[in-house]
Amino acid sequence: MTRRSLIAAALGLPALNALAQFRVEVTGVGLNQLPIAVAPFRGQAQTPVALAAVLMADLERSGRFKSIDAAASALDETSRIDFAQWRSRGADALVTGSVTRLADGRYDVRFRLWDSVAGQDQGGQAYVVPASDLRLAAHKAADYIYEKLTGERGVFSTRIAYVGQTGRQFNLWVADADGENAQSALASPEPIISPAWAPDGRSLAYVSFESRKPVVYVHELSSGRRRLLANFRGSNSAPAWAPDGRTLALTLTRDGNSQIYLIDARGGEPRRLTQSSAIDTEACFSPDGRQIYFVSDRGGTPQIYRMPVSGGAAERVTFAGDYNISPALSPDGRSMAFITRTGGAFRLQLMDLGSGAVTALSDGGQDESPSFAPNGRLIVYASRQGGRDALMTTTLDGKIKARLAGKGGEIREPDWGPFLTSA
């Protein structure tokens, strides 16, 4: 059972199956990419992680950078830089660094960013980490470099959650933003669907079928403890957090058809928000917390609507096509990613909410469950392409796509977590 199949069952529509594995792969060419070289870190050959490669892959996935071959010679953060040589190679920026194993088994990771055009030191950082956090150190370095060169916060040290199924086993995976280092937050022989990050990044809400019906839990990641949030009569599904973390929207059938309700994050009696005779589901909040976007078939086919959280009339948002689902709002509230059905395929699209203009971000496969990166510059989604499951990211123009690393089996319903609360 997946979120799409649950929605399809409610709306009387066919569901899709997905099987495969996925690998790291970046495709496409973007405009105005900054050419950057990342030299092999001195000492990284003696570590279990190729730090420079992880860092460069992060920058490439963002769509903002073009990789320049740094050759095989290692340069550390104290190396004397021949800027003319790097300019001749076409690199406007250069990253150098080192990694040293300490006596206690931890690693000292250092890096420095250089402006090859101006011949200037742009600063750097140092981290002391256990071997298990070497990839995180590379992601943090990529965050620093991304922010220095773009003026925007990087998302490489954030996390994603998604659902995987291998045989009869379901897992709720939490992974790095590149899909690596996946850890199982929950394993179950019964379906798990609809993972949703709390705004503070400490918990995940999700739907479990272990009670032989869909119920909603909130799972604290650090302790592994979880609490039952919604087990009302009928179906309990599609949790979505309000931006302040105090309230969640849910889809409940306690009063008949699937409708949107609001519930305190601590539990209690839910308040019904939608009041239609149709099927209303898949709610998400606007970033300011004032609006709810949701899917409804009240017009005859599944379309996306919005309404005030305080209640009132619903306004239709999507008009093109007869099947539009899975709304996800950008952090600035200006754009909405969603899935549309075109010629039997489910494809990712992006709408400018100001103008209503729609951009197709994928041209094939069976896409589902878009979720924005916390800086709003990338979208993660699940896709089935060529008979294989893939966890994908795309830039907002659709030009740069990356197939992320991760676990095999069926891959579904990714949700991109918030910025880490600690540095």
Task: Name each region found by the language model.
Residues 79-144:
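Amphipathic beta-strand/beta-sheet edge segments enriched in Tyr/Trp
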Residues 153, 164-171, 187-190, 207-216, ...:
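A flexible loop/linker signature enriched in serine peptidases of the S9 family
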Residues 199-200, 243-244, 287-288, 331-332, ...:
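Residue-level detector of Asp-centered blade-edge/turn motifs that repeat once per structural unit
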